[in-house]
């Protein structure tokens, strides 16, 4: 699982870098990510929105840590 820590990033910077980071790493064969957001609910919402817009889904509290999100590809969007 690949991780990125967004502590210290502005919402604008996250909106600029995260979509490409997710897509590039997914295209390189990585299909699950831990995104460390800290406890900011607004940052979590920004990340969830970016994930949704780019075909990923983000889960809260997946490891008992409320400061990170588990991000995976949204399989319901894949048409076979």
Predicted regions and their residues:
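Loop/turn elements at beta-strand to alpha-helix junctions within RNA-recognition modules
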Residues: 11-12, 39-41
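Short beta-strand
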Residues: 59-63
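Conserved helicase motor "Helicase C" RecA-like lobe of SF1/SF2 P-loop NTPases
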Residues: 41-54
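Active-site beta-strand termini and strand-to-loop segments that position acidic
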Residues: 72-75
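Short, flexible loop segments at boundaries between secondary-structure elements
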Residues: 64-70
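Conserved small/polar residues in nucleotide/adenosyl-binding loops
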Residues: 78-80
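An N-terminal amphipathic alpha-helical segment
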Residues: 1-30
């Amino acid at each position: 699982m690949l991780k990125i820590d967004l502590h210290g990033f502005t919402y604008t910077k996250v909106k600029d870098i995260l979509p490409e980071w997710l897509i590039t790493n997914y295209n390189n064969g990585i299909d699950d990510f831990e995104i460390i957001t800290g406890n900011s609910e607004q940052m979590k919402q920004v990340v969830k929105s970016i994930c949704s817009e780019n075909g990923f889904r983000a889960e809260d509290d997946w490891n008992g840590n409320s400061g990170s999100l588990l991000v995976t590809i949204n399989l319901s969007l894949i048409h076979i």
